[in-house]
């Protein structure tokens, strides 16, 4: 099966700086993936442009979907992570990540969540986790702990995807790499960067897995969002 992770930045066409859901629907369709993890998605809100992007993409692609709301921008406009998939969704939930008690780092702080879903992949249950981690080290520590708890509570084959906002050598993600393999190890171009798409200089987007064999992995080097997506082909062991 093919899986993709993509920070879509509100479905903002990076080239033209307008919200363009059909552009993203067509791009995702081109990749022909079975599971697609999306970060920075909007839900139906009161502001102009805050529409239900998950259902719009899901309807366009004729696939199952789930939206995990992390926050409401200015109290009325949902924003979070989403999962699109051709497989039946047996269960899905939004797991909120604890916020740090103190905000001492000079970065933007934001409440985060993880999307937890169990999919029926050809008769076998597979755990999927989608997460967009914070910029502050204290935020990432809570996010990593939360995702590890989700993983440790299950024995299912698992895929963890998303924009983690930190590189592998930062050390912040080590507990995840102790539990999971990184599809990047089979990337067609070793060390390929995912951000920013207009001048890539770091890899902060990931497809991690357990209970699978990774057959291939590649970064799609096309400027649609401010991130490049990653696509990997996995087979259940």
PLM regions: where:
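Active-site regions of metal-assisted phosphoester/phosphodiester hydrolases
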Residues: 1-35, 59-60, 64-67, 73-237
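Generic alpha-helical scaffold signal
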Residues: 18, 47-51
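Active-site neighborhood of divalent metal-dependent phosphoester/pyrophosphate hydrolases
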Residues: 39-46
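Short consensus segments that form the blades of beta-propeller domains
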Residues: 46-47, 106
């Amino acid at each position: 099966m093919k899986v993709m992770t993509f920070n879509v930045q509100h479905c903002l066409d990076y080239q033209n700086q307008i919200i363009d859901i059909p552009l993203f629907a067509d791009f995702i369709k081109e990749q022909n993936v079975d599971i697609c993890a999306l970060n920075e998605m909007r839900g139906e809100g009161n502001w102009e442009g805050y529409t239900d992007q998950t259902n719009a993409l899901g309807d366009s692609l004729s696939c199952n979907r789930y939206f995990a709301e992390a926050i409401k921008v200015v109290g009325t406009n949902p924003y979070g992570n989403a999962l699109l998939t051709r497989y039946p969704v047996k269960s899905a939930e939004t797991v909120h990540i604890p916020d740090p008690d103190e905000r001492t780092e000079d970065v933007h702080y934001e409440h985060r969540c993880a999307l937890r879903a169990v999919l029926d992949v050809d008769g076998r249950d597979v755990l999927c986790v989608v997460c967009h981690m914070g910029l502050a080290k204290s935020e990432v520590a809570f996010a990593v702990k939360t995702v590890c708890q989700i993983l440790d509570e299950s024995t299912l084959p698992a895929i963890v995807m998303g924009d983690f906002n930190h590189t592998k050598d930062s050390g912040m993600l080590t507990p995840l790499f102790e539990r999971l393999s990184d599809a990047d190890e089979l990337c067609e171009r070793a060390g390929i960067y995912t951000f920013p798409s207009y001048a890539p200089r770091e890899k902060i987007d990931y497809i991690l897995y357990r209970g699978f064999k990774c057959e291939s992995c590649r970064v799609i080097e096309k400027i649609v969002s401010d991130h490049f997506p990653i696509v990997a082909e996995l087979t259940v062991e």
